[in-house]
Amino acid sequence: MKWRVNTTPDAFTHSTVDPCRFGALNSEVIFSSLELDVGSCLVDAGCGPGEYSVLAARLIGETGSVIALDRDPWMIEQLRQTIAAQAITNIHCQVADLGAPLPLRDQQADAVMISAVLHMPGLTDRWQILFSELQRGLRKGGKLAIIEKSNASAPADHPLHLRLSPETIAANVTPHGFEQCGLVELRADKFLILFEKY
């Protein structure tokens, strides 16, 4: 079953409480789509400095865990500093190439999120590896949320040739044991496409 939610302006904020990469999108919309709860295990693939990882760690509590992966050592170091400064104990971060085998156990995660990553040069030709690895690391029934900028418009800060349509993403994800189960318009130029592992 497919569903679509059009969020209101209240669905995102520009405060430091929710400092997300896409102009501070509301993490509640994203995390509720992933069905995160106390005790969940989330993989934040392409975590950057870890804005979502930190917010998720608070939500899932000490019995849950966040596995934060990024190919950039500097980003991982920023997240490690945040973890230390805030005494967070349930985030495990690691430098990892998303286009190569991932440091995940089979069916380890309840949910995976990928925000503003798929369009990056160097990864676009290795999606098949990434989606196969995420399928391996995600439990049956687990959710995969992909957040990208829409290709419907092209502001100067994000060239059109780097934009992805939900249809393009779905065509590449579904052959790897996933079914599309949602499409959320986060803003006019940003969307979340949701999949479930079957």
Regions from the PLM with identified roles:
Residues 128-140:
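A short glycine-rich, Lys/Arg-flanked "PGG" loop and its adjoining helix->strand segment in the class I
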Residues 99-112:
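A short acidic, Gly/Pro-enriched loop at the edge of an enzyme's catalytic core
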Residues 6-25:
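Class I SAM-dependent methyltransferase Rossmann-like catalytic core
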